[in-house]
Design a protein with these regions (language model features):
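Short, compositionally biased P/S/T/A/G/V-rich stretches that sit at domain boundaries
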Residues: 1-3, 104-120, 352
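Short edge beta-strand/loop segments characteristic of extracellular beta-sandwich folds
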Residues: 18-24, 124-132, 605-607
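Active-site-proximal helices and loops of the catalytic beta/alpha 8
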Residues: 287, 291, 305, 310-316, ...
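C-terminal beta-strand-rich structural cap/linker in extracellular carbohydrate-active enzymes
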Residues: 624-638
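Loop/helix patches that line or flank the sugar-binding groove of alpha-linked glycan CAZymes
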Residues: 204, 220-228, 239, 455, ...
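Substrate-binding/active-site clefts of carbohydrate-active enzymes
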Residues: 213-249, 256-396, 417-421, 438-439
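Hydrophobic faces of well-ordered beta-strands that scaffold small-molecule active sites
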Residues: 208-210, 251-253, 297-299, 402, ...
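Aromatic-rich carbohydrate-binding modules that target alpha-glucans
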Residues: 2-3, 8-64, 70-103, 133-170, ...
Length: 638
């Protein structure tokens, strides 16, 4: 069941609800709360047993939240909540029946001078007003004696969101709201506050990222198939002309540290680069060349779990309760592994990605999705916290930021404390595959934008939603993330997804989506090979998109390559695309038209995802003819 125990004021959300979740205890050794707030992942919201029930209290923004429980790895809805729905998120291939919690305060209209309701970015101040769905007919911002009409930006299950944007304002701002509601005139305010700026380094906003999985990218003996394909950091260094030549000025590397797998998400040694990838020497030489070229670098940090073969975990396996590292992991009992487990391991009967094992080959520890190779770290341990801080700080002497793997499987407060110990220039993004609000603002500057990816899939790839519905999803992300939206890492695909080109089956539609990615708010990123039309395979699990890079240029799609370079050049040379406001002009059917503008610069982006010609109107009375599955970007100035 769930219960709400009032609200607490919050400088980001205005207020948060105290929500208690509980479920009967039935002999499980552990339990976790799962939900749309942590992408239904174990690890982040561990429950406490009191008597005959598991309990946890969390602070949640108002709205509708989907949730369930993990009882020693067993997924279970709330048996005491009859409100159930099928929750589907194509972005991380989740579709299950889950429980639904509604969290809402008493007021029909709400505003607070907090970060998500009053913020400054790019020389502009944004005002946001929230109302119960259907309550407000219109709303007006009263500012300095002027009436400014507010635009209805988005709606969700409970609320309508209204917004207004004005030029930058100095010092405290005095303002109020007027309007018409279903019950007559309404008035809210006055308020007096200083608009809030998000604390984050500015350099990421001017970047276009290129993501590389080193084993699959370049090397002296790169193979087209197999587990280990032979790519390394020496090969990557030799191919920087290709990356820089297209205009990419930031690089994201998947894990490069010592591990037993090609992908590196089972780290054995956090302080040394994998010898298979060229070791520390290759990394140092790569960093020198990146700095010479002005290319920023972020690394992939795996701190939800380690490898089974990490020395700390091996010490626990050998010494059991006497190990000094027993508190490093979520150990459930002793011995940590059975004798039959060790025999199966030594005889090669336990492949690293298995979730099952021969009869009797048991293990007594929590792990990433029940994979024995990846034992879960104990995020409550102060030793683990200091270890993570030390590792991240060590590599930030050479790198410029971190992407944190399975960030939604670690408590949000853990990342808040980590960020406090990092240099202010470091760009920190988390892998949060659903609603990321609990992880943004205080913890991460941005997240891998799975919320946007979900909307992109449904509109561009699957055609499940109309342009009007697509716009609503865009604006919901915007009101929920506020200025942090500009720091989101936006993508069409990555190492955990299928290649976008494989999903859309059409080069023209792929380029339409790429044009949107490069001209929308947030930081655009391209997965290696997308620029040449590299294909993967559908239904291939996590390996679906991890095709080795093709370096024979006769195999490249020149049309995609040239358009990618042109879009990157446009992005890097446009402050409007990096910092500018977003103004929807036309979102109808399969056509979207919007303006990005700042100061004296204005670009209009028109994208036709339909199979017919479309004529659209532009500001200033001009019109534009768009062929099927095409886009145009027009410099309209001011």
């Amino acid at each position: 069941m769930y219960k709400t125990f009032g609200f607490v004021e919050d400088p980001v959300f205005g207020r948060l609800a105290r929500v208690e979740f509980s479920i009967p205890y039935r002999g499980e050794r552990y339990a976790y709360l799962l939900g749309s707030f942590n992408a239904f992942n174990e690890g982040s919201f561990r429950m406490e047993r009191r008597g005959s029930r598991w309990f946890i209290r969390v602070l949640l923004p108002e709205g509708v939240w989907r949730y369930a429980f993990s009882l020693e790895g067993r997924f279970e809805r709330d048996p005491e909540n009859e409100n159930v729905e099928t929750y589907r998120r194509p972005s991380y291939k989740f579709e299950k029946e889950v429980s639904v919690a509604g969290v809402i305060g008493p007021e029909p209209v709400y505003h607070s001078p907090s970060l998500l309701y009053l913020y400054t970015f790019g020389g502009r101040v944004n005002f946001v007003l929230r109302a119960k769905k259907g309550y407000l007919v219109s709303s007006t911002l009263i500012l300095k004696g002027k009436d400014i009409e507010m635009r209805k930006r988005a709606s969700d299950e409970l609320f309508d969101y209204f917004g207004a944007e004005v030029g930058n304002l100095e010092g405290p701002v005095e303002y109020s709201f007027l309007g018409e509601s279903s019950e007559g005139p309404f008035e809210l305010g006055p308020f007096s506050a200083v608009p809030i700026a998000l604390k984050a380094p500015e350099w990421p906003l001017e970047r276009v990222f290129y993501q590389v999985m080193p084993d699959r990218f370049a090397g002296n003996c790169l193979r087209d198939s197999g587990n280990f394909c032979g790519g390394d950091l020496w090969g990557l260094k030799e191919r920087l002309d290709h990356i820089a030549g297209l205009g990419f000025n930031a690089l994201y590397l998947t894990p490069i540290f010592e591990s037993t797998t090609y992908h590196g998400y089972d780290v054995v040694d956090y302080f040394h680069v994998s010898r298979r990838l060229g070791g520390d020497e290759a990394f140092d030489e790569l960093v020198k060349e990146l700095r010479r070229r002005g290319i920023k670098l972020i690394l992939d940090g795996v701190f939800h779990h380690t490898s089974f073969f990490h020395p700390y975990f091996q010490d626990v396996v050998e010494k059991g309760e006497e190990s000094r590292y027993v508190g490093f992991y979520r150990i459930l009992g002793f011995p940590v592994v059975s004798k039959r487990f060790l025999r199966a391991l030594n005889s090669g009967l336990l492949p690293g990605d298995t979730r099952s094992a021969p009869m009797g080959a048991e293990w007594n520890y929590e792990s990433f999705y029940s994979v024995w190779l990846m034992p879960r770290l104990n995020s409550d341990s102060e030793e683990v916290f200091e270890f993570v801080v030390n590792v991240m700080g060590y590599w930030l002497k050479k790198a410029d930021g971190w992407r944190l793997d399975v960030a939604h499987g670690v408590p949000p407060d853990f990342w808040v404390r980590v960020r406090e110990r990092m240099p202010s220039s470091a760009y920190l993004i988390g892998e949060v595959m659903d609603d990321a609000r609990l992880y943004l603002f205080r913890g991460f500057h941005g997240v891998m934008n799975y919320a946007l990816y979900d909307a992109i899939l449904k509109f561009f790839a699957f055609g499940e939603i109309s342009a009007e519905e697509f716009l609503n999803e865009l604006e919901l992300i915007s009101v929920r993330y506020g200025p942090a939206e500009y720091y989101a890492y936006n993508f069409l695909d990555n190492h955990d997804t299928e290649r976008f080109l494989d999903l859309v089956h059409d080069e023209r539609l792929y380029l339409c989506a790429l044009a949107f990615l490069m001209t929308y708010k947030g930081i655009p990123a391209v997965f290696y090979g997308d620029e040449i039309g590299l294909r993967g395979r559908l239904g291939g699990g996590l390996d679906a998109g991890r095709t080795p890079m093709k370096w024979r240029e006769e195999n490249w799609n020149r049309g995609i390559l040239e358009t990618t370079g042109e879009l990157i050049h446009l992005r890097r040379n446009s402050k409007a695309l990096q910092f500018g406001t977003f103004r929807p002009l036309l979102f109808r059917g399969r056509t979207i038209v919007y303006e990005r503008a700042i100061d004296g610069e204005s670009l209009v982006v028109a994208i036709n995802c339909s199979e017919v010609h479309v004529k659209v109107s532009l500001p200033g009375g001009k019109s534009l003819n768009l062929p099927p599955l095409s886009f145009r970007i027009v410099d309209t100035g001011r």
